[in-house]
Design a protein with these regions (language model features):
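A structural detector for beta-sheet-dominated domains
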Residues: 9-11, 46, 57-59, 89-91
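Short, surface-exposed beta-strand/loop "edge" segments at domain boundaries and coil↔beta transitions
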Residues: 14-17, 62-68, 94-101
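Ampiphathic alpha-helical segments that act as solvent-exposed interaction surfaces
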Residues: 24-25, 69-85, 122-133
Length: 133
């Protein structure tokens, strides 16, 4: 089983927007729209109080390329719209190395940082008991 939870607040820059030409802001917005329009994961930009964001949940019996593609989309957007911030949590119990751990992808200031989560991991016994036959 794979479980992916992700969110990304989309912000054009982490720098002072007053010093960035409007044309540059619009170019960033267009690039983000292009990424979303051309993704194969059915991601779409949502808005709350005028702020664009992504909110993603995937729960599948087996890992597919979808999780990797979602991480790639979040990464591309955060590299272009460098003020974007958010995270993705992934638990893939078929992953040979991390089957018992949540893996996190943290997005901030145009970077994606990968870490093994310590809040829910190891998943057994932190969030589930071991099954005994």
């Amino acid at each position: 089983m794979i479980e992916l939870h992700g969110w990304l607040s989309i912000v054009e820059t982490y720098k002072n927007e007053d010093f960035i030409p409007q044309e540059e802001i619009e170019k960033i917005q267009e690039q983000v729209k292009f990424i979303i329009q051309n993704n194969t994961c059915d991601l779409e930009i949502l808005y709350q109080n005028g702020t664009p964001f992504l909110n993603t949940l995937v729960c599948c019996n087996h890992n597919t390329t979808q999780a990797k593609q979602i991480i790639e989309v979040y990464t591309k957007i955060s590299e272009i719209a460098t003020g974007s911030y958010g995270m993705i949590y992934v638990w893939d119990d078929e992953d040979k190395n991390y089957y018992n751990h949540f893996q996190t992808y943290i997005f901030k200031k145009g970077q994606c940082e990968y870490k093994i989560d310590t809040n829910f991991s190891p998943c057994i016994p932190t969030i589930e008991d071991a099954f005994i036959d």
